[in-house]
């Protein structure tokens, strides 16, 4: 025979257990150079700029398409 729970799991206990299952909200900002939405502290994928400066050795999506 299988083991059965001694008591019914309450809704509150069930919901408390599920509090950490939500996906985190990404912090999006607009790029100062091209105004596209990007994640904070990342190089812009469209123009290759970070903090107003062009990043060396980074190929943006615009250059990859050509």
UniProtKB/Swiss-Prot annotation:
Region described as Disordered: spans on this chain: 1-21
Keyword Ribonucleoprotein: yes
SUPFAM superfamilies assigned: Zn-binding ribosomal proteins
Coiled-coil segments: none
GO biological process: translation
Entries under InterPro entries matching the protein: Ribosomal_bL32, Ribosomal_bL32_bact, Ribosomal_zn-bd
Keywords attached to this entry: Ribonucleoprotein, Ribosomal protein
Compositional bias annotation for Basic residues: 1-18
Family affiliation: Belongs to the bacterial ribosomal protein bL32 family.
Matching NCBIfam families: rpmF_bact
HAMAP family according to UniProt: Ribosomal_bL32 (MF_00340)
Protein name listed in UniProt: Large ribosomal subunit protein bL32
Source organism of this protein record: Mycoplasmopsis agalactiae (strain NCTC 10123 / CIP 59.7 / PG2) (Mycoplasma agalactiae)
Species lineage: Bacteria, Bacillati, Mycoplasmatota, Mycoplasmoidales, Metamycoplasmataceae
């Amino acid at each position: 025979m299988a083991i059965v729970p001694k008591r019914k799991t309450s809704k509150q206990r069930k919901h408390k257990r599920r509090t950490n299952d939500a996906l985190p909200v990404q912090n999006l900002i607009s790029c100062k150079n091209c105004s596209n939405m990007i994640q904070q502290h990342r190089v812009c994928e469209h123009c290759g700029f970070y903090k107003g400066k062009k990043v060396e050795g980074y190929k943006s999506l615009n250059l990859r398409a050509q």
